[in-house]
Curated annotation (Swiss-Prot):
One GO cellular component term noted in the UniProt record for this chain: nucleus
Task performed by this protein: Transcriptional activator that binds to the consensus sequence 5'-[AT]GATA[AG]-3'. Required for gut-specific differentiation, specifically acting with the GATA region-binding transcription factor elt-2 to control normal gene expression and promote normal formation of the intestine. May have a protective role in response to infection by Gram-negative bacteria such as P.aeruginosa.
Example GO biological process: positive regulation of transcription by RNA polymerase II
Lineage: Eukaryota, Metazoa, Ecdysozoa, Nematoda, Chromadorea
Biased composition (Polar residues): 1-18
Full protein name: Transcription factor elt-7
Sample GO molecular function, one term: zinc ion binding
Length: 198
Protein backbone atom coordinates (compact mmCIF):
# COMPACT_ATOMS: atom_id res chain seq x y z
CA UNK A 1 0.00 0.00 0.00
CA UNK A 2 1.09 3.46 -0.79
CA UNK A 3 1.06 6.18 1.81
CA UNK A 4 -1.66 8.74 1.56
CA UNK A 5 -0.68 12.06 0.20
CA UNK A 6 -1.52 15.12 2.20
CA UNK A 7 -2.07 18.51 0.79
CA UNK A 8 0.40 21.07 2.02
CA UNK A 9 -0.93 24.42 3.09
CA UNK A 10 1.15 27.57 2.95
CA UNK A 11 2.40 29.08 6.22
CA UNK A 12 0.41 32.03 7.59
CA UNK A 13 1.90 35.48 7.27
CA UNK A 14 3.56 37.28 10.16
CA UNK A 15 0.79 39.87 10.45
CA UNK A 16 -1.87 37.22 10.92
CA UNK A 17 0.19 35.57 13.65
CA UNK A 18 0.68 38.91 15.41
CA UNK A 19 -3.01 39.84 15.24
CA UNK A 20 -4.44 36.52 16.44
CA UNK A 21 -4.44 35.89 20.16
CA UNK A 22 -2.49 32.78 21.11
CA UNK A 23 -4.59 29.72 21.74
CA UNK A 24 -4.29 28.56 25.39
CA UNK A 25 -5.32 25.29 26.82
CA UNK A 26 -8.09 25.24 29.46
CA UNK A 27 -5.53 24.10 32.07
CA UNK A 28 -3.50 27.27 31.55
CA UNK A 29 -6.62 29.35 32.11
CA UNK A 30 -7.42 27.36 35.24
CA UNK A 31 -3.88 27.86 36.56
CA UNK A 32 -3.93 31.61 35.94
CA UNK A 33 -7.39 31.90 37.47
CA UNK A 34 -6.35 30.10 40.66
CA UNK A 35 -3.00 31.83 40.90
CA UNK A 36 -4.50 35.25 41.51
CA UNK A 37 -7.31 34.35 43.88
CA UNK A 38 -6.26 35.93 47.14
CA UNK A 39 -9.57 35.64 48.93
CA UNK A 40 -9.41 31.86 49.19
CA UNK A 41 -7.31 30.30 51.93
CA UNK A 42 -5.26 27.42 50.48
CA UNK A 43 -4.82 25.83 53.92
CA UNK A 44 -7.61 23.96 55.63
CA UNK A 45 -7.50 24.16 59.40
CA UNK A 46 -9.28 21.67 61.67
CA UNK A 47 -12.01 23.18 63.84
CA UNK A 48 -10.72 24.52 67.13
CA UNK A 49 -12.11 23.16 70.40
CA UNK A 50 -14.41 25.48 72.31
CA UNK A 51 -13.85 25.84 76.04
CA UNK A 52 -16.94 27.43 77.45
CA UNK A 53 -18.63 27.02 80.79
CA UNK A 54 -22.03 28.67 81.14
CA UNK A 55 -21.90 28.44 84.95
CA UNK A 56 -18.66 30.36 85.18
CA UNK A 57 -18.72 34.05 86.10
CA UNK A 58 -18.12 36.38 83.15
CA UNK A 59 -15.29 38.21 84.97
CA UNK A 60 -13.15 35.07 85.23
CA UNK A 61 -13.30 34.14 81.54
CA UNK A 62 -9.92 33.84 79.87
CA UNK A 63 -9.97 34.76 76.21
CA UNK A 64 -7.19 34.45 73.68
CA UNK A 65 -7.33 37.52 71.39
CA UNK A 66 -5.56 35.66 68.55
CA UNK A 67 -8.04 32.79 68.54
CA UNK A 68 -11.80 32.80 68.60
CA UNK A 69 -12.27 30.39 71.48
CA UNK A 70 -11.99 30.49 75.21
CA UNK A 71 -8.99 29.23 77.16
CA UNK A 72 -9.59 27.35 80.41
CA UNK A 73 -8.52 29.09 83.59
CA UNK A 74 -5.22 27.84 85.03
CA UNK A 75 -7.06 27.23 88.30
CA UNK A 76 -9.38 24.75 86.58
CA UNK A 77 -6.58 22.57 85.24
CA UNK A 78 -6.30 19.11 86.83
CA UNK A 79 -3.58 18.83 89.44
CA UNK A 80 -1.04 16.12 88.73
CA UNK A 81 -0.60 13.59 91.48
CA UNK A 82 2.72 13.10 93.22
CA UNK A 83 2.87 9.57 91.80
CA UNK A 84 3.07 10.78 88.20
CA UNK A 85 5.54 8.96 85.99
CA UNK A 86 6.76 11.96 84.01
CA UNK A 87 10.53 12.35 84.24
CA UNK A 88 11.95 15.29 86.15
CA UNK A 89 13.73 18.06 84.31
CA UNK A 90 17.51 17.57 84.14
CA UNK A 91 19.59 19.79 86.38
CA UNK A 92 22.37 20.17 83.82
CA UNK A 93 21.58 23.84 83.09
CA UNK A 94 21.25 25.05 86.67
CA UNK A 95 24.51 26.57 87.85
CA UNK A 96 25.81 28.12 91.05
CA UNK A 97 28.87 30.22 91.74
CA UNK A 98 30.99 29.34 94.74
CA UNK A 99 32.51 32.40 96.32
CA UNK A 100 35.49 31.56 98.58
CA UNK A 101 35.92 35.17 99.67
CA UNK A 102 32.61 35.02 101.57
CA UNK A 103 33.77 32.18 103.86
CA UNK A 104 35.80 33.15 106.93
CA UNK A 105 36.81 29.80 108.40
CA UNK A 106 36.37 26.10 107.66
CA UNK A 107 33.61 25.59 110.24
CA UNK A 108 31.26 28.08 108.63
CA UNK A 109 28.94 26.90 105.92
CA UNK A 110 30.09 27.84 102.43
CA UNK A 111 28.26 30.68 100.69
CA UNK A 112 26.53 30.05 97.40
CA UNK A 113 25.12 32.60 94.99
CA UNK A 114 22.39 31.49 92.58
CA UNK A 115 23.41 31.94 88.98
CA UNK A 116 21.13 32.26 85.98
CA UNK A 117 21.71 29.94 83.00
CA UNK A 118 21.83 32.98 80.69
CA UNK A 119 25.06 34.08 82.44
CA UNK A 120 27.31 32.13 80.08
CA UNK A 121 25.58 33.29 76.92
CA UNK A 122 25.53 36.96 77.95
CA UNK A 123 29.19 37.50 77.07
CA UNK A 124 30.01 38.81 80.58
CA UNK A 125 31.68 35.57 81.56
CA UNK A 126 35.15 36.93 82.19
CA UNK A 127 34.21 40.42 83.36
CA UNK A 128 33.27 40.78 87.01
CA UNK A 129 33.16 37.05 87.87
CA UNK A 130 36.89 36.31 87.37
CA UNK A 131 37.74 34.81 90.76
CA UNK A 132 34.59 32.75 91.18
CA UNK A 133 34.40 29.03 90.43
CA UNK A 134 31.45 27.59 88.54
CA UNK A 135 30.13 24.22 89.71
CA UNK A 136 27.15 22.14 88.67
CA UNK A 137 24.41 21.57 91.20
CA UNK A 138 23.80 17.90 91.94
CA UNK A 139 21.00 17.42 94.45
CA UNK A 140 20.35 14.18 96.34
CA UNK A 141 23.43 12.60 94.77
CA UNK A 142 24.75 9.35 96.21
CA UNK A 143 27.98 7.50 95.41
CA UNK A 144 27.23 4.27 93.55
CA UNK A 145 30.07 2.48 95.41
CA UNK A 146 30.23 3.71 99.02
CA UNK A 147 26.78 5.41 99.19
CA UNK A 148 28.12 8.68 100.60
CA UNK A 149 26.21 11.88 99.96
CA UNK A 150 28.98 14.39 100.75
CA UNK A 151 32.05 14.89 98.62
CA UNK A 152 34.09 17.77 97.29
CA UNK A 153 33.59 16.65 93.69
CA UNK A 154 31.23 14.23 91.95
CA UNK A 155 32.65 12.14 89.12
CA UNK A 156 31.19 9.61 86.69
CA UNK A 157 32.61 6.11 86.30
CA UNK A 158 32.92 4.16 83.04
CA UNK A 159 29.28 3.01 83.22
CA UNK A 160 28.10 6.61 83.73
CA UNK A 161 27.13 6.22 87.41
CA UNK A 162 27.96 8.97 89.93
CA UNK A 163 30.84 8.28 92.29
CA UNK A 164 32.45 10.39 94.96
CA UNK A 165 35.86 11.85 94.25
CA UNK A 166 37.72 9.37 96.48
CA UNK A 167 36.15 6.19 95.02
CA UNK A 168 36.65 7.33 91.45
CA UNK A 169 40.28 8.38 91.88
CA UNK A 170 41.09 5.19 93.83
CA UNK A 171 39.70 3.06 90.99
CA UNK A 172 41.54 5.07 88.32
CA UNK A 173 44.84 4.74 90.14
CA UNK A 174 44.64 1.10 91.34
CA UNK A 175 42.13 -0.44 88.85
CA UNK A 176 40.38 -1.95 91.90
CA UNK A 177 37.24 -0.69 93.63
CA UNK A 178 37.93 1.23 96.82
CA UNK A 179 37.49 -0.90 99.98
CA UNK A 180 34.57 0.16 102.15
CA UNK A 181 36.88 0.20 105.20
CA UNK A 182 38.52 3.33 103.77
CA UNK A 183 35.20 5.13 103.39
CA UNK A 184 34.53 7.89 105.92
CA UNK A 185 31.47 9.93 106.80
CA UNK A 186 33.13 13.26 106.01
CA UNK A 187 35.73 13.67 103.25
CA UNK A 188 39.18 14.69 104.44
CA UNK A 189 40.47 18.05 103.27
CA UNK A 190 43.92 19.56 103.32
CA UNK A 191 44.81 22.38 105.65
CA UNK A 192 46.12 24.97 103.27
CA UNK A 193 48.39 27.78 104.36
CA UNK A 194 47.16 31.32 104.05
CA UNK A 195 49.18 33.51 101.68
CA UNK A 196 51.11 36.17 103.56
CA UNK A 197 49.81 39.65 102.91
CA UNK A 198 52.29 42.51 103.00
Amino acid sequence: MLPETTTLQPLPSVTTIMNEPPARSPMEDYYLFNQFQYNQNPYVYPPQPVYYNTWQDASTHHFDPFQSYQIPSPYEQPIQSSMCTTPLQPLEDSRIIFDESLTKNENEQKSFVEQDSSYESSGNRFGSQKGKKIAKVIRDACCSHCSTTTTTLWRKNDEGNLECNACNLYYRHNKVKRPLSLCKQKPTTRKRRQAKKE
